[in-house]
Amino acid sequence: MEQDNSPRKIQFTVPLLEPHLDPEAAEQIRRRRPTPATLVLTSDQSSPEVDEDRIPNPLLKPSLAMSPRQRKKMTRTTPTMKELQMMVEHHLGQQEQGEEPEGAAEGTGAQESQPPGTPGTGAESRLGPSATAQKPAQPSPRAQERRGEEPSTAKTSQDSQGASAV
């Protein structure tokens, strides 16, 4: 149905000049050229001493070795207590080594994961142990908005439940 003179069909002709490489060498280069997936894996393995710092979450390292199709099939799950503890220990280890500035360390909330009375937490000494223990008790207004509740009504319903439970 389509004619050869159709405007949709574009044909290119390459002039036969002196080629820079013979066809076999060009084919070898094409075969050796890495795919984007292998580039990601080789760049991560290039310096093993920096590899741990480049990927802060040790739980993500096994997923990097998987193909994109395998990664797509994986479902994202919440971390278990053991995994969460491992992430907190890794974060605290980085803080002790001084890799993270003090201002950024206080903003992460990692100090709250330590039990009250543990020396070395600056936030606890300023706020007192009762302030850090009460902080996670009520959800943030943003979390309440995500669930469709208004922050003011959710707070009063929690207060009334707490009063009736006492």
UniProtKB/Swiss-Prot annotation:
Residue list for modification Phosphothreonine: 35
Domain of life: Eukaryota
Sequence positions bearing Phosphoserine: 43, 46-47, 67
GO process annotations (BP): glycogen metabolic process; intracellular signal transduction
Molecular functions per Gene Ontology: molecular function inhibitor activity; protein phosphatase inhibitor activity
Presence of the UniProt keyword Acetylation in the record: yes
Assigned keywords, A-Z: Acetylation, Carbohydrate metabolism, Glycogen metabolism, Phosphoprotein, Protein phosphatase inhibitor
Region named Interaction with PPP1R15A: 143-166
Modified residues (N-acetylmethionine): 1
Region (Disordered): 1-166
Biased composition (Low complexity): 104-114
Known role: Inhibitor of protein-phosphatase 1. This protein may be important in hormonal control of glycogen metabolism. Does not inhibit type-2 phosphatases.
InterPro entries: PPP1R1A/B/C (IPR008466)
Organism of origin: Oryctolagus cuniculus
The protein, known as: Protein phosphatase 1 regulatory subunit 1A
Biased composition (Basic and acidic residues): 19-29, 143-152
Composition skew (Polar residues), residue ranges: 153-166
Subunit composition and interactions: Interacts with PPP1R15A.
Listed Pfam families: DARPP-32
Lineage: Eukaryota, Metazoa, Chordata, Craniata, Vertebrata
Region (Essential for activity): 9-12, 42-54
PTM annotation: Phosphorylation of Thr-35 is required for activity.
GO cellular component annotations of the record: skeletal muscle myofibril
